[in-house]
């Protein structure tokens, strides 16, 4: 007797699976696009002198996240290293407006700083409450596998985006003044990454 033919039943067609996959990434991009309005480019500027005794500007750039507005100034969380030795700090918004900022506080243990832009320097569109980033909580025990989106400069370029997921939680970082619970992701970065 000849063997019975193998019948393969297709569950859903491939094009709809590809379309669903593409739609998922479109939705992730839309979330990142909307969230990027809460990010700014922070430029730390300092003057240096070259070997020929000529003065030149040295600029470092990173991403900042609008985290609050106290009614007097807008507060932005950013990378401390980029502004550490800066003689002036500039903040550039999504609409290309660039204004001066001042350092409010720094934490060398975490590598973070808070800078401030005076409200009177900003048009009303940049004072909108919707620009303040909505921060989540890491207290949940079921964070493993949750999708994450890195915005800012995760690949070292301004306005780059990277997608991944939380891969571990629970490792502790013990520093002088505090203990921090670390979460890791499968996002990769490079030495120029911030965001």
Residue ranges, per PLM feature:
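Gly/Ser-enriched beta-turn/beta-hairpin loop segments
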Residues: 50-59, 105-110, 116-121, 169-183
């Amino acid at each position: 007797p000849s063997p019975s033919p193998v019948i393969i039943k297709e569950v859903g067609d491939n094009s709809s699976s590809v379309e669903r996959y593409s739609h998922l990434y479109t939705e992730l991009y839309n979330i990142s696009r909307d969230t990027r309005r809460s990010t700014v480019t922070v430029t730390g500027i300092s003057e240096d002198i070259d070997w020929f005794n000529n003065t030149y500007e040295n600029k470092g750039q990173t991403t900042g996240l609008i985290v609050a507005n106290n009614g007097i100034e807008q507060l932005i969380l950013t990378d401390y290293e980029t502004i550490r030795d800066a003689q002036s700090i500039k903040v550039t918004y999504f609409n290309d407006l660039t204004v001066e900022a001042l350092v409010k506080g720094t934490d060398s243990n975490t590598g973070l700083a808070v800078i401030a832009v005076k409200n009177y320097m900003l048009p009303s569109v940049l004072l909108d409450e919707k620009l303040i980033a909505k921060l989540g909580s890491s207290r949940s025990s079921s964070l493993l596998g949750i999708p994450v989106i890195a915005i800012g400069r995760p690949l070292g370029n301004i306005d780059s985006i990277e997608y991944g997921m939380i891969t571990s939680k629970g490792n502790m970082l013990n520093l002088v003044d505090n203990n921090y619970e670390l979460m890791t992701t499968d996002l990769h970065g490079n030495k120029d990454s911030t965001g």
